Amino acid sequence: LKNAFVGAASSIRIKSDTHYNQLGYDDNTITGVTVAAKTPGSYANGIRISIIDSAADQILTVPSGNTVQVGTAVTQTAVGRIVSGAGGTSVLDGYVKGIVTKSTDTTLEVKVLSHVSAAGTVTNVNYQQGGIYNFTPSGLVGLTTAGSAVVFNGVDVTYTQAVDWFERQEVVLTSTDANGNPLKIEWDAIADRPGTSTYAAARGGRFDELHVVVIDDKGKITGNAGTILEKHLNLSKAKDAEYSVGSTSYWRKYLATVSQYIYGGSEPAGITTAGYSIPSNNTLDADSGWDQDADGVNFGVSGVITASLGGGTNYG
């Protein structure tokens, strides 16, 4: 008798909520398991799970043959951009800085981190589609290898297009339409983009938010393939996070309490660093793991993780 799960572990068995607590999973992560079915047995095999965080803000299209490494700092002049505030408007100098969180032959997926003034003052900023702190629809960006200070006569790359990352994220199902194509659900039809919670921001943390959906992929439960069984939105990677006093938003604790179908186990494999511990020389943050308190943490990112529960077995 085993629970269906997503992850690299060989198997897992959690008999009940009481057993979950007895195993210490209420306080400790489950190694090698991203999510697990609430009760053991084969019934949960095939349930589709999708998790999304704010892995990137924009996708830049660059010339074929791109070899830029994940973690590279990306900069672009901000000179002349106009910022509106309560006291009127001001004109920016300096540059916008981001970090590469994924790199392909023709694209750079980039997360916006900060504005650096001409005087060298670093201010954390948040991307907003069509806003001030982003990379222009096309143009030139500077590239600086992680661990090196930004220089203005370094490596540049011209890109032909910058598109919104979140708008292009989908939940891909194993069920297909009449033409044999996989059914897909657009993430922006499910929820607003995740980012940084108010709780984490107040403690100097960033990028803790995530969404989780549970889907009846084959229609085994509802009779309708692709039905969303549960939506858990604006959860947090931070262990101490709360929506309000006494109301947890920590993803594992929240799912253990609220979800009918799944427990949260531990961060997905292969999370990517989304910040620098020393911005002046772009030293990658080495303490970005999920499932720790929010204070001062730039939480690592995973993008979209979509998988089917499997490995659940009955007696015999």
Question: How does the language model describe each region?
Answer:
Residues 1-316:
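Surface-exposed assembly/interface segments
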